[in-house]
Amino acid sequence: MTALVIAEHDNASIKGATLNTVTAAAALGGDVHVLVAGHNAAAAAAAAAQIAGVAKVLHADAAALADGLAENVAAQVLALASGYSHLLFPATAAGKNVAPRVAALLDVAQVSDIIKVVSADTFERPIYAGNAIATVQSGDATKVITVRTTGFDPAAATGGSAAVESVAAAADVGKSSFVGREVTKSDRPELTAAKIIVSGGRALGSNEKFMEVLTPLADKLGAALGASRAAVDAGYAPNDWQVGQTGKIVAPQLYVAAGISGAIQHLAGMKDSKVIVAINKDPEAPIFSVADYGLEADLFTAVPELVKAL
């Protein structure tokens, strides 16, 4: 039994979500191989070979794989699938784009968002916005799985010594072409990788107040900024700051929720955080039910005082 992890990378380095997915693959009990499909991605393949627990790295190199087009990556995975019992993808935007294509082409049922490996064919995954855990079993010979990265600790990025094997690149499917990419530059940590997150809700009242109140606290803590869906929908924060079931799933060491009531959809995206601090003037706010520390106070007074204390 051998599992293949489809690495997420930028052709130069391996993304953190891959490390969590390797941990999930290792829990299956067999060998773990990693596929690095890209262009001029030798550095990423070398980095994958250093990941603890990886037995082999497969490196497919072609111009058609340079930008991670889902159709071409799926074709590459399909070309290798017969040699593996499990195909694992991080449950990121990229992984969720490729995995269903692979499952459909293999005519198997995808197992999505797993948070625990029970056995080689049985897994746990959250349902109903995380309010229940489903145990699912797959009878397919090849199991296509997406891994909720917050459910598994990352594998060590160093300490491994896997061999890197070049494999033939699949032909360009030709169904899509890469047009361009707009990358947002920020001095703050990336939201899903941040160790500390300061999030704001609709109670902040405006984009100006959102930034005025929360930015000093985030600066003091070296934190990423997040937001509830209500705050994003109101225009207080950009879409890529949204935390929740329809946003980003996070599990930082510290999550500070200011003016967030705690709708079930938001809780689904952050309740695995190690320490949760909630600031809200409503004592009945649902956010207090998951908070480790709760401060019943007006955030416009409490947050500046907290900044001063830090």
Question: Where do the model's predicted regions map?
Answer:
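N-terminal glycine-rich FAD/FM-binding segment characteristic of electron-transfer flavoproteins
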Residues: M1-L310
